[in-house]
Amino acid sequence: MMTENDRDALVDFLARHVDTQILTHAEVSAFLDFCDFEIIERGRIIADIGEVGESLYFLLDGTAELIVGPTTNEVPVGQIHAGEMLGEMSFFDRQPRNVRMRARSSVRLLRLPREKYNRLRLEHPVFTVLLLEYAIVSLDHLYRRTSTDVAQLNQYIHSMSG
């Protein structure tokens, strides 16, 4: 359940992470009516391999990890930090997920279900464009972190063989 204090904090959060200069405080607050507020405990699965994304997630607090492989042999391949979006790839391309998203710590997030996103597109198209920009920036952050990790691993492997 979202309290008024949560709502005010979320409006402030969105103002820090989305270009809200073209939106009023009331429009940002109205966006929250399309979202569900959730708290996911450490170690819980947010979205699993093989599922088709039916929601976008906005990580407010905490850290989530991206994992591949069966639960008996998991390999972490990335992290999502507060202020970033989760689940955008499967949500937009409607393909099954190839990574598991798990709460690395207790996380607070906003969930935007597909049916509410579709309504948001019609009622607030400007906000939808901002969400797409936000998705691109979140994917860019993930790609850059992952590229850096792969480069460091590659450098380490070459230093060990040389």
Language-model features: locations:
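Cytosolic regulatory regions built on CNB/CRP/Popeye-like sensor folds
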Residues: 1-162
